[in-house]
Amino acid sequence: MIDDRAARAWAILFARAVVGLIFFMAGVWKVFQLGPIGHVQRYFLPFQHTFLPTWSLWAVGFAIPFVELIAGGLVIVGFQTRPALLSLGIILVIVTFGHLLDKPLYALHEHVIPRLALVLLVLLLPREWDRFAIDAIFRRSTPSDRSSPN
């Protein structure tokens, strides 16, 4: 029988693995198959006709694939989990803004909301529950510091 502490650790591992994989695999596809420039051209340059400066479309569109790849990988292994999740949350805000700029009634419930729910779940669960993370190894090897943002 699995006790409550172990069940919580497994639950957060599964949630962390799923949200990490979603973003990591999106990053893999965007970096290695589509290419960062292709990502900009396909998903960001169509917004050139808006008030957004073209340089910002290039900068954000080029960076997102790498952030998804790196932050997703960090979430999977549980290293610097909270900063990685904050990065992914920022990406979700950017993506939501872009979709709503294009279509004000965009169906957020299909893609954005499930990802946001997982990001928030893992972000808000107590760090102490996440026993199967690299962050947990560092917590065990150093004195507890409740003011740490990680």
Located regions from the model:
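Extended, low-polarity transmembrane helix blocks
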Residues: 1-39, 50, 54-70, 77-150
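Glycine- and aromatic-enriched periplasmic loops at the membrane-periplasm interface
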Residues: 40-44
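Short, helix-capping/interhelical loops that line the mouth of catalytic, cofactor-
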Residues: 47
